[in-house]
């Protein structure tokens, strides 16, 4: 089964048994690994660029659906230390609320603060509020 000469495969993807994206390899050969929360993968907890699933699994153990709201700190630290060639973004999320914290490949953390109604209230980057949301309710 030969591909048409004008057909160019962009990405190759693999999936976990629970249906979420496990790896994506671009045309340039760079592999990205995705890790998800343990509640059937509601939220991503890590995006690891320039690493293989085998490399990540050697550090995390079975990556299928094992993280509650984010990577355990020791696993995140090991990934960053043992995969210096990788660009790692981590995400912590609260069920039914949303993302609470992201840490980019440079180690810069962004916090997401929610109000008592679980609506996004502030985004804090490098200790400073960069975005504030105000909700004006009618008949409240």
Each language-model region and where it sits:
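Beta-strand elements of repeat-based all-beta scaffolds
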Residues: 1-26, 30-104, 109-140
């Amino acid at each position: 089964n030969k591909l048409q000469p004008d057909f160019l495969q962009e990405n190759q993807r693999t999936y976990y048994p629970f249906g979420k994206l496990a790896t994506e390899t671009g045309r340039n050969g760079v592999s990205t690994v995705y890790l998800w929360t343990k509640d059937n993968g509601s939220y991503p907890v890590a995006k690891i660029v320039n690493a293989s699933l085998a490399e990540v699994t050697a550090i995390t153990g079975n990556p299928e659906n094992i993280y509650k709201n984010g990577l355990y700190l020791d696993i995140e630290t090991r990934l960053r230390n043992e995969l210096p060639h990788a660009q790692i973004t981590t995400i912590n999320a609260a069920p039914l609320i949303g993302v609470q914290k992201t840490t980019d490949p440079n180690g810069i953390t962004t916090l997401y603060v929610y109000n008592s109604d679980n609506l996004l209230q502030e985004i804090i980057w490098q200790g400073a509020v960069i975005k504030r949301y105000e909700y004006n309710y009618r008949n409240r």
